[in-house]
Amino acid sequence: MLLGGAATMQAHAQGASRGAAQGTSGSQLAVQVNDDRITLSVAKVPQVYLYGPIDADAAQRVGALIQSRKIPPNSDIYLNSPGGDLAAGIALGRLFRAGNMTTHLGSPRRTATQPIFPKSSQCVDACAYAYAGGLFRWAPTGSDRFGAQPVAGNASAATATAYLKDMGVDPQVFGNASSSEVTWLDAEQMRKDGLANNGRLTPTAVYGPANGGTSLTLTQLARDGEHRLILQCHPDGLSITANYAIGADRARQMVARATHSYFEINDKPAAEDNHANISTVGSSVVFTQSIPLAQLSQLPSAYLMAAWLADRGGSVRYGFWMEMDPVRNELRSFSSGCQQMAKQTSTTKG
């Protein structure tokens, strides 16, 4: 049901509608909150659609819904707007980031009072700045369009630039400040420029000595939980441990169903005997596997590492993958240290 203003709040309070909208006059940003049982069972979080022009009071209305937890933290935000008030767009983005929310492009669901919505969506101008506030930002799909536009005027441009930097987005992605033209970005370009991360933050690396050898810990925060790879080099070999944090119940279910678990490097088996041991520790599935030091040569140039487990049928696999380019320097340092250790071990045995 689509309702406006105070009627929406009343419908939520009475439980008469779980899909409601504010600001439906056509000159304001409208809000549709979908938190019905089916949505939550599939998406795990509410799906919130913001559509129409971003008016000056849009952030205040959305903020009130967040404050009342009608829009709870970690919600999925779907945007479809031609833009509007820049300050309001930036304020919306900061609300999204504070709530660890995920931004997408998308049109609201059809309802009895609003049976027709365009299938394609666009997000441009102030909407693009709101989108940048998502902790996780999904690139557009299908015919959806994303338009980045620089801000003119010294004060406004400085504010917009500072905001994008705070959100971890390179301001240059939004174009040259000397031009006011919209740059329409496709999914590949947004992913390449870091504007879209498709549910995965850039991995971080910690390299150093550990237990008589060297250790490299790679951590990535993703939409479905935390992913971690721990590589440890010892005189007698290399071990890889993966932590796939997905919740205690789901972790136990996956391990119970699994028939095969393994690591991959560059989409290929990490070892000739590619079988990892798996267990549940807390809320994580934990993979462990030993790899001969002789296979270290593939690590410095690796572009992808992954940990997978297959279910009983073998047709579906679960797990995660991690790009190595963001942690290339630490990976090379670790590989160099391991190779040096392998030489010393060989000399000692000789």
Where are the model-predicted features located?
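C-terminal segment of classical bacterial N-terminal signal peptides
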Residues: 2-11
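A generic "folded-domain core" signal
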Residues: 14-17, 21-22, 30, 46, ...
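Catalytic and GAP-homology cores of small GTPase regulators
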Residues: 26
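Cleft-lining beta-strand/loop regions that shape enzyme active-site pockets
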Residues: 30-142
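Stable alpha-helical elements in mature extracytoplasmic
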Residues: 58-62, 88-92, 123-127, 134-135, ...
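Proline/Glycine/Serine-rich low-complexity intrinsically disordered segments
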Residues: 66, 79, 100, 108, ...
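Charged, glycine-interspersed solvent-exposed loop segments at helix/strand-loop junctions
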Residues: 75-76, 147-209
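Short secondary-structure transition/capping segments
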Residues: 115-121, 151-154, 210-214
